Amino acid sequence: MVATVVGTRVESLASSGIEAIPKEYVRPQEELTSIGNIFEEEKKENGPQVPTIDLEDLVSEDEEKRVRCHEELKRAATEWGVMQVVNHGIPIELMERVRAAGAEFFNQSVEEKEKYANDHASGNIQGYGSKLANNASGQLEWEDYFFHLVYPEDKRDMSIWPKTPSDYIPATSAYAEHLRGLATKILSALSLGLGLEEGRLEKEVGGMEELLLQMKINYYPKCPQPELALGVEAHTDVSALTFILHNMVPGLQLFYEGKWVTAKCVPDSLVMHIGDTIEILSNGKYKSILHRGLVNKEKVRISWAVFCEPPKEKIILKPLPETVSEAEPPLYPPRTFAQHIHHKLFRKTQELGAK
């Protein structure tokens, strides 16, 4: 049995004592067969596992170690498009501060969080929100979120940043700055992996001035019927790179070789996705992998996704000339980042309308 409730926060639904989730949250029948118990899925040792890449030697003076690290990164980006990265250079205590600040924000009452509510109708996408049923299926996801631009500093709107807890702004700001430095290192290594100059990919996605870091804190409340719902439906990221921190509760699944693979919770790691932007620039040599988020009955899951995105209109995304040949013609038409986002939304609406 399912209930019908629309226009409320998922957290409010979850804490109301419902035993059946509203029908808007129930996934289509063809998806339900692949949704399992995430804790059981995480324990599985057989089958493919998301690669873990040690970045300690990413910029090592020792050429042999550096080359080995770059090769492992390239292999993961080529074969998977996602990896767990360790020894990434971001202080563990800073990651803990970010986790604590985000959790404390979401531990406030819904009424308190509503002070930061976004308003898609008026174009204010930053702030506290939930998925709107604005697609052809009317489908909803079992999550609330907080979304805001965190870097560069001069493009931030501090009026929307949480004032409580007091460490939210300093911790998140420092974390964003560290991630921006890590993005440069990763983009350099990925450039070299394509036979390009090391600064090339960063330049193509906007450079130090224009590459934007957008943070989305995903809050997945406990779900009474996790076998029927998804926290985030299957998608690829439009970004260049995405870095994900989480609270060590499993949920992320990757669609690899025709099957859903659960990412294990690796201590002190970040999950890093290659996004569509890098897939396009590399002419498909680096992969943007399809992924989704499962929910559970027992534990709240929180993840901090930071999307490194090019400017929406200034840059034309297309395969770089060096990645194209007679044998490997361009796989993607030229588009701005905004056009790529629009194309994905339009295509999804078309697919839903055809069902």
Curated annotation (Swiss-Prot):
Tissue: Expressed in stems and leaves. Expressed at low levels in ovaries.
EC number(s) on file: 1.14.20.4
This protein's record includes keyword Aminoacyl-tRNA synthetase: no
Catalytic activity: a (2R,3S,4S)-leucoanthocyanidin + 2-oxoglutarate + O2 = a 4-H-anthocyanidin with a 3-hydroxy group + succinate + CO2 + 2 H2O
Cofactor(s) needed: L-ascorbate; Fe(2+)
Domain Fe2OG dioxygenase: 211-310
One Pfam family this sequence matches: 2OG-FeII_Oxy
Biological-process GO terms, alphabetical: anthocyanin-containing compound biosynthetic process
Cofactor remark from the record: Binds 1 ascorbate molecule per subunit.
Superkingdom field: Eukaryota
Molecular function terms from GO: L-ascorbic acid binding; leucocyanidin oxygenase activity; metal ion binding; oxidoreductase activity, acting on paired donors, with incorporation or reduction of molecular oxygen, with 2-oxoglutarate as one donor, and the other dehydrogenated
Keyword DNA-binding annotated: no
Residues bound to 2-oxoglutarate: N218, Y219, Y220, R301, I302, S303
Binding positions (substrate): Y145, K216, T236, E309, K344
UniProt binding sites for Fe cation: H235, D237, H291
Pathway terms, separated by semicolons: Pigment biosynthesis; anthocyanin biosynthesis
Keywords: Dioxygenase, Flavonoid biosynthesis, Iron, Metal-binding, Oxidoreductase, Vitamin C
Functional note: Involved in anthocyanin biosynthesis by catalyzing the oxidation of leucoanthocyanidins into anthocyanidins. Required for the accumulation of anthocyanin in red-fleshed kiwifruit varieties.
Family: Belongs to the iron/ascorbate-dependent oxidoreductase family.
Name of protein: Anthocyanin synthase
Protein species of origin: Actinidia chinensis var. chinensis (Chinese soft-hair kiwi)
Taxonomic lineage of the native organism: Eukaryota, Viridiplantae, Streptophyta, Embryophyta, Tracheophyta
UniProt gene name: LDOX
